[in-house]
Amino acid sequence: MFHELYVRWAQFGVFCPMMRSHGADAPREIFLYGKAGEPVYDALVDAIKLRYSLMPYIYSTSWEVSHRNSTFMRALFMDFLSDPKTWNMGSEYMFGSSFLVAPVLHAQYTPEQAQQILKENEGWGCKAQESDIPLLSVDFTQSKEMELYLPAGSQWYDFWTNEVAEGGQKLKVTTVFNRIPLYVRAGSIVPLGPDVQYVTEKKWDNLKVCVYPGADGNFVLYEDEGNNYNYENGAYTEIPMIWNDAKRTLTIDARRGCYEGM
């Protein structure tokens, strides 16, 4: 169960302001969880790659949070107050203005017998013997199911398939081991960055800009030097993007501002 939930924690971490694998005297590096071609390793790689690809969106949202008093992780009622079904929703949230995240919170693959052994050995200094935990027969290639709710007042796009669903309904969705349910609000503009090993490996010269039709939308791409506080003195740029849904046009305005090395 530890391996399974470690993957789920990593997938949840992708959609937190800071993604960090932290622990005391516990293995955290992905190469300690298998090798390429094995489900746990591959799922961790997928999560890390997704996080890096979302950096333009995440960094720009960080600017919205700090400069315009916005919020990163938003309870659904903050954006959909007119929908009473969101008022007490504790298993989903908005990540910025675009993403509805429904993390997998419980083990779906680990046999119940193994889960019981681990529960009985919880706590500091209490460790179940590996030989006591029957994980060898776990098939991570199987599909599972979970329920989620899409708030009323918007259409929603499945991030993985681009299938569109109307808001205001509960869905039973298929889950797989290497990803969690993830939806994008209609009208969103989401910039995706290059495939990198670390954030500053490549410049954002050729971003992929994804538009999700169904409503008007806007987004401001924010950039700065990335390694200092010069932005506090105006060393940053903004590129406004506007989606007109009726005309099906995306307008990318001129860059505003400047910083060293841009």
Roles of regions detected by a PLM:
Residues 179-262:
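Accessory, solvent-exposed terminal regions and/or long lumenal/extracellular loops of proteins
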